[in-house]
Amino acid sequence: MARLIEFRNRAHEVSRLEAFSDVVFGFAMSLLVVSLEAPKSYHELLETLRGVLPFAFCFFIFIIIWFEHHALFKRYALHDTPMIALNTVLLFVILVYVYPLKYMAQVAMHRARADLPRDGAVVLFTIYGIGFALVFWLLAAMYAHAYRRRERLALNEVERIETRERIYDNLFVGLFGVLSLLLVRSPWPQFAGFVYFLIAVPKTIIPTVFGRKRTAAERRMLAASAPELPGPSAPEESPAHG
């Protein structure tokens, strides 16, 4: 849906908190690098190239998280104690989340299955699911904190709707991490990985529902701000001839 009113950015420069967060994101991505050394043989080159797809998958996941984080600080520019605390926990979880994410990608690309013990899949999906849920629930908590500060931030009706959308979006995405770790311990462990594809469902429904609310709010705001057009003036009376 075309947006008639854009979300106002309250941050006009990069804060120390956001700069520090970017450094942590960059460090986390450096841990995903396929190899720190250039291949010295044809065999090493092939091994390095086999790691490109898992790296690309992990890189894409981190870009999604980084973009969500960047948009949050750009829009709200909140640097109070609760936001700093939530951001610190998020960065810690991301650093811990790096290696399970990388190993999960390698397993999915058939590079690490030989090293996976019989009960290893249960442990792997549990660790990955917890990390996945925590990342998106922490983002949801950060958006919820911004929504609690809506009066102080002077969020208009459209911005409040969009903030609630981000809360619900991150909450529902995080639920799939919990659903995955429950499935891997159920009689249907084979669906523990495929369940993540169902993220497309809330990613479709939530923007549709809140998009309609946003459109209605935009129309109300535009109607309220539109200048009143003067009504048709009464015709002047002609002087009477008598």
Where are these regions (language model features)?
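Multi-pass alpha-helical transmembrane bundle typical of ion/small-solute transporters
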Residues: M1-G242
